C-alpha cells in the first residue's frame, strides 16, 4: 500500500503536475496539503478520471487538505474529535479509512514567530492531534498512518544549518516535544527508521537556490502505528518532483507498506 504526503502549495497551480505524478508513481493513497481552494472548487472529476476517489476539507485561499484514494474512502471526517467544543478555525486535518487503514492528512500551523499567537495555536493544534488519536484509535492494534506537513523538524539532523534557526519556530523544544507525545502513543517516524543521516530534507525555500544548495528542512512526516510501521517496505523523498517548472516548495514523501 503506497501512501504519499505532499504539500502542493496550491492545487490549482499544480494540478497538471499532480496528475502526471499520480500516473507515473501510482499511489494508493495521496494526502495533499495547502490545496488553497474551497470544497466547491476541488477537482474531484479529474481524480475520478485517474481512477481515484477524493475527499477535501478546504476554505479558500489558505490551508486545505485532501485524501485521494484508489483503495476505498470511508469514514471521512474533517477536523478534530477530541472532546472539545471549539472546532479548529482552519481547514487543516482530514481523516479517512482506506482499505482498512485509518489515514490523516495534516497541515500543522506554521507558528510564524515564537512570541506570536499562531505559535500557541500550533502547540495547541498538535496537542489536539494527540488527543484525537488517543481517543479514537488504538495504535497498539489498529493500522493508522498520520502524514502531512508538520512544520516541525523533529531534530537537528532535519535542518540544513541548526544554528541558523536558533530562536525560530519549527525547531523549538515545545514543538519537538509535541511530536514526541505522538510517539509516546506508539507512533513511529518511519523515515527515521530507515535513514539516520542528516541532510535529507522535504522542503526548500524558493529563494536563493536553496534546493540546489541543499538548504532545506525535513518537515513532511509519516507517522505509523506499530501495525503499520512493522509493515513498512521503504520510504523516500521524491526530490525529482521539486525540480522543473513551477514546482511546489515541498517534495512528496512516499511510503510503501505491506498492508494490502
Positions of the model-derived regions?
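Short, Asp-centered acidic motifs that coordinate Mg2+ and/or phosphate
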Residues: 28-29, 143-145, 221
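Acidic/histidine-rich, metal-coordinating catalytic segments
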Residues: 142-156
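Catalytic metal-binding/acid-base residues of hydrolase active sites
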Residues: 9, 36, 107-109, 151-153, ...
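Active-site-proximal beta-strand elements of phosphoester/diester hydrolases
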Residues: 1-10, 100-115, 147, 250
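N-terminal, active-site-proximal structural segment of metallo-dependent hydrolase catalytic domains
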Residues: 1-56, 62-65, 154
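Metal-dependent phosphoester-hydrolase catalytic domains
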Residues: 39, 48, 76-81, 155-260
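Surface-exposed cleft-lining segments at the edges of enzyme active sites
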Residues: 81-84, 108-127, 163-167
Amino acid at each position: 500500500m503506497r501512501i504519499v504526503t505532499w504539500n502542493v502549495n496550491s492545487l490549482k497551480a499544480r494540478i497538471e503536475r499532480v496528475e502526471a505524478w499520480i500516473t507515473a508513481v501510482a499511489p494508493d493513497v495521496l494526502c495533499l496539503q495547502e490545496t488553497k481552494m474551497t470544497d466547491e472548487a476541488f477537482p474531484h472529476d479529474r481524480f475520478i478520471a485517474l481512477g481515484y476517489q477524493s475527499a477535501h476539507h478546504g476554505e479558500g485561499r489558505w490551508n486545505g487538505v485532501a485524501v485521494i484514494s484508489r483503495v476505498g474512502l470511508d469514514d471521512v471526517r474533517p477536523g478534530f474529535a477530541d472532546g472539545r467544543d471549539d472546532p479548529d478555525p482552519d481547514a487543516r486535518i482530514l481523516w479517512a479509512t482506506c482499505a482498512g487503514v485509518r489515514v490523516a492528512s495534516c497541515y500543522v500551523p506554521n507558528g510564524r514567530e515564537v512570541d506570536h499567537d499562531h505559535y500557541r495555536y500550533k502547540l495547541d493544534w498538535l496537542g489536539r492531534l494527540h488527543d484525537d488519536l488517543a481517543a479514537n484509535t488504538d495504535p497498539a492494534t489498529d493500522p493508522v498512518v498520520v502524514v502531512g506537513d508538520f512544520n516541525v523538524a523533529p531534530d537537528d539532523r532535519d535542518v540544513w544549518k541548526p544554528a541558523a534557526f536558533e530562536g525560530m519556530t519549527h525547531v523549538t523544544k515545545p514543538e519537538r516535544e509535541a511530536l514526541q507525545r505522538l510517539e509516546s502513543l506508539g507512533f513511529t517516524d518511519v523515515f527515521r527508521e530507515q535513514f539516520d543521516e542528516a541532510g535529507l530534507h522535504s522542503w526548500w525555500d524558493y529563494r536563493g537556490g536553496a534546493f540546489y544548495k541543499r538548504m532545506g528542512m525535513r518537515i513532511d512526516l509519516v507517522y505509523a502505528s506499530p501495525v503499520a510501521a512493522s509493515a513498512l517496505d521503504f520510504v523516500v523523498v521524491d526530490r525529482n518532483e521539486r525540480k522543473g517548472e513551477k514546482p511546489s516548495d515541498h517534495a512528496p514523501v512516499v511510503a510503501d507498506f505491506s498492508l494490502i
